[in-house]
Amino acid sequence: RAQRITDADVTELFEQGDTYKNHSRYTTIGNFAIYYTLDDKTRRFVEPRGIEAYKITGLVSYVLCERSFTSLFENIAKDLRLKEVEYVSSIWAEGMSLLSEDKRYRRQLIADVGYITSSVAVVQGDGLVSLTSFSLGGGHVASDIAMMFEVPFSAAEEVKDKIDLSLAYDETSYYEAGENGKYRFSALDVNEIAKSRLDTIAEFISESIAQSGFECNAHCPVYLTGNGVTTIRGAKEYLSQVLKKPIEIIAPDVPCYNK
């Protein structure tokens, strides 16, 4: 007969689906339900506990980590006499903390563009439907400027912080960097360098979306986070134009962090 679903039933479901328990290279650091189904699978549930059913199934997300990585930190923890080490996927944590439960009822796209690495994830329920990472970020904008103008990286970083892609510059416009404006850069050239790098980042985001299998139409927003390009004025609008999708910057709903 039907019985109420309990924590033990959910735990058993997660255990049955984990095929990485004895994997030589990877270990599971988290398992999260995208959704649950009961009996005839005609309905999806976010929370099945307490519901009477004969059978529970579901789509579960397993987050993996290389054993070489976990072994390193477990040895450090052992030396420090720490009893336990917990590993958390950063983009999973972003999805859970920055997107409301109502939004996560449907699949959502997060693009975390960092300084030198970026990730694109499809989030649903309490899990990740897909995750792609690539070695590109806002730091590459500064690197391109330093290389093209043959200036110190510190000066290129300073210029990057002044970029404004929303303004219409002319040939007389310039950015300054260094002590007493030691370095001058054509604003037109700097902006073109930044746009070129953003084009590449947008291309990788598009490829990641395609690989995920998520059918994201022109009205499907891309939630942008990370400090790589969100601080570049006009970058959000430019990426939206290139990707042909609305871009929304998301940040923690905490004073001084919600910008």
Regions found by a protein language model. Name each.
Residues 1-108, 166-172, 177, 187-191, ...:
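Nucleotide/phosphate-binding catalytic cleft detector across ATP-hydrolyzing
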Residues 1-14, 144-147, 151, 256-258:
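N-terminal phosphate-binding loop and adjacent alpha-helix
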Residues 95-96, 230-232, 256-257:
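Flexible loop/turn segments at secondary-structure boundaries
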Residues 240-259:
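Conserved phosphate-binding/catalytic loops in two-lobed NTP-binding clefts
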Residues 101-131, 145:
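Gly/Thr-rich phosphate-binding beta-strand-loop-beta motif of the actin/hexokinase/Hsp70
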Residues 210-215, 222-225, 248-254:
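Hydrophobic alpha-helical bundle architecture
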Residues 100-102, 230-240:
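Short glycine/threonine-rich loop-to-helix capping motif typified by GTGT followed
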Residues 62, 67-75, 92, 124-203, ...:
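Phosphate-binding glycine-rich/basic clefts of nucleotide- and phosphate-handling proteins
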